[in-house]
Amino acid sequence: MEDRVREIVAGYMGILVSEVTDDGNFIELGMDSLTLLKIIIDIENEYDISIADEEIVDIRNFADICKLIEKNFS
């Protein structure tokens, strides 16, 4: 799952998959809120999950996205 999510994030950011680190701050990588929303929508569709809007605002890095995916799979 993590590899695919890294690919999605890297694709939207226009960066290499290797540049998407667990704790790298998305804002420092140049991500804006619209890009984050597009990423979340793709992830929701790919994994057939729903992530609440109030959870999205707390996403700061790749590890945060993975935690939300795991939480919503449960």
What annotation goes with each model-predicted range?
Residues 33-39:
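Amphipathic alpha-helical interaction surfaces in cytosolic regulatory modules
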